């Protein structure tokens, strides 16, 4: 009995010894999967992502009946019944995704390079050369709407990457598409441009704005000696920044204020003296009257005695 118990204990200890490392390995794998996420070296292409978005949008529209009806869905259905001519947002989103997918395929197939070679004919010997200005002016209005859509899509896609990888002809075409004749190309004349803006402030039909009035084609030859006659240059000296001295204009104002103050003080003092003199005269007269009345009384008393 004792031997059988010893054998059972040995078997259990041996199994525990073998199971322990297995548990540790499994726990280690779980921790690695939990805290470590492998970095994908290859990014899924944009066309595949667009296809996935289109498929999810279509599947969402087909499986929406199986899901519980939400309040927003019921309200959208009610408004769609009340306004049958209103645009469908899901349909617009799906059409936009299809359009992006089509433009992505056109861009990946190299259609933009075909358009640039056809209309602008960049140099085949040097891939980083600018397009001739005359060719750009003549052939850019010939681009169709589909070509311009592809160009806009290419600009939006390539501007997200490294701009140092862009070619000079594409940058030139990008700048021309965005700004046209603005900036340094003010001397160019666009043949198919809109007419000049009419005056909306005065509302006179015969007055038109001309944005090139300020440009003078004549070269102005001004010598350095004539610059002083055209522009008066003021040189600031250190006396202007000295707080101990006062400029002549400030001195004149301060002197005028002091003069006016002294004049007002003298005038007020003279008026005060003229008011005091009548009071003194009245007191003297009253004293004289008193002395005269006393003298008369003294004379009367002497005559009666």
Curated annotation (Swiss-Prot):
Residues 1-24 form a transit peptide. One of its GO terms (cellular component) is mitochondrial membrane. Its main location: mitochondrion. It is a single-pass membrane protein. The chain crosses the membrane at residues 250-266. The keyword Electron transport does not apply. The keyword GTP-binding does not apply. Belongs to the GEP7 family. Involved in respiratory growth and required for cell survival in the absence of prohibitins or GEM1. This is Genetic interactor of prohibitin 7, mitochondrial. It comes from Saccharomyces cerevisiae (strain AWRI1631) (Baker's yeast).
